[in-house]
């Protein structure tokens, strides 16, 4: 007859299956892998204690030693089981969101530049109304130069300069 968890309700609340424990360990080990793959500046922003930070740095050093690296990742997972990982997960999510925000801003600037280049004075007037601090003369000059370079099939230097100027204004 197979063993069952205790019928006592007090004990059944604390019961966690072996499979659930393994899933949690794998999640924490994956979180450790994400920490190892961060850049130095990103890792410096993580709320890690010294022991965990040292373990992550060691894993980076032995990355090309397959078995040692695997065991180090397991050790990082073990260290993380003993700690509250919510702040670490939050910091990683903030890093991911910051990248997504930068990407969306980049796309918005590209769209604005393309609109200014293709729709002419109406788009420029609309942009100036939305951003009164923008230099109308500089924008007109860059747009004219970009159109000229496109007509002459030259590299789009002015379009890049327009992008940089828009990034300064919007970013």
Curated annotation (Swiss-Prot):
Residues 1-30 are annotated as: Disordered. The keyword DNA damage does not apply. It holds the Pfam family DarP. Disulfide bonds: none annotated. It is found in: Cytoplasm. One of its GO terms (molecular function) is rRNA binding. GO terms for biological process: assembly of large subunit precursor of preribosome. SUPFAM superfamilies: PSPTO4464-like (SSF158710). Gene3D superfamilies: PSPTO4464-like domains. Keywords: Cytoplasm, Ribosome biogenesis, RNA-binding, rRNA-binding. InterPro entries: DarP, DarP_sf. One of its GO terms (cellular component) is cytosol. Member of a network of 50S ribosomal subunit biogenesis factors which assembles along the 30S-50S interface, preventing incorrect 23S rRNA structures from forming. Promotes peptidyl transferase center (PTC) maturation. NCBIfam families: PRK05255.1-1 (NF003593). Belongs to the DarP family. This is Dual-action ribosomal maturation protein DarP. It comes from Idiomarina loihiensis (strain ATCC BAA-735 / DSM 15497 / L2-TR). The lineage of its organism: Bacteria, Pseudomonadati, Pseudomonadota, Gammaproteobacteria, Alteromonadales.
